[in-house]
């Protein structure tokens, strides 16, 4: 997902990430990457875009997505922006239904369409059309955007002047699967490549019959074939060489790739509250640390990294835990004057455990979940000594959250979305480095291979 890249202010790092992704694609013989997501995630209840989006501000989404796409294309990999004309403001998933986006043309132009327009103006190569019903853009056909000539041909290709390859989203998805002539309809709408049509043989037979009946012209088919062939040449497929698998894993997971990934995570962790400048911790000799991870059943990378800096007693709380053990774990926390709570779950049962663990205390809360989950914890946020958003529970996100607490890295991240009534997009406090951090040789300007 893009969640940890969207709170990074330095777009050159996102370009480097895209470039490294392009290098890895090329090494594996991949010519096309169905990224970046250009959807503006303005609906916190969105079940399918969410953390895949670069945020909820159209200009920010455009800037970061274009940086990533340019990085990809600098390595000869086609970027494919998606899901035109915008899947961000819906609470439904087009894998399972046909979402409806009910906004005016003016709203769509200023929000959903803006990143796509900037992407097209930047001269990038690929676009994916989404399975969405958008009455303001097409009130005549009642077709999803991916199958609508008004949206694909008239809007995308004529008005916005997109000249690259147009792909449909997967046609087997519920948002498009109910149309029996989906392949014919998609081609007539203006798409060039059809992804995963239902029963391809049947769809091909239908296209052959359509050619015989003049429902679609040979010229349209030939133009699309020539367009695909042109891009095959551009992407080097006229000089195809089999991929050598020797040393593949080592070359993919090289030190530079790790350096970029680590930089992305280090710059994304966001400090939202820091009462009394508690973070980074000082006077360690006066502190006793208890660190409970909630929503997991095994000791975490977060707890391991905390123990690299101080004597920290780890514990766990999770839904389904024996009541006696739950009570004992919560009671034990009162022994420590510094309580760190790592939050790994948005489940109701685990939220209640966090609230119980916080009662009567001034904890440091560290969230390894979506920022939208903060709403579920709003009752306990005022009592927290500090609040950190790490966005996900990958090992690096956990390790850098721990380093931030102890001053091994500086706090730089900015919240990429608005959390209604709590935090505004762009919020994020800064802290200095006060202790040594943990890094790879490449991050220190050295070469680990020497």
Q: Predicted segments — roles?
A:
Residues 3-4:
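Short, small-residue-biased leader/transition segments that mark boundaries at the very start
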Residues 8-23, 58-63, 108-110:
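Glycine-rich anion/phosphate-binding loops
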Residues 20-34, 281, 290-291:
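Acidic-leg catalytic submotif of subtilisin-like serine proteases
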Residues 31-41, 81-87, 172-173, 200, ...:
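Short glycine-enriched loops at secondary-structure junctions
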Residues 32, 79, 166, 363-364:
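Hydrophobic beta-strand scaffold residues
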Residues 34-43, 84-90, 237-245, 430-433:
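Flexible hinge/switch segments at interdomain interfaces of large molecular machines
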Residues 158, 179-447:
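Preference for extracellular/luminal or secreted protein segments
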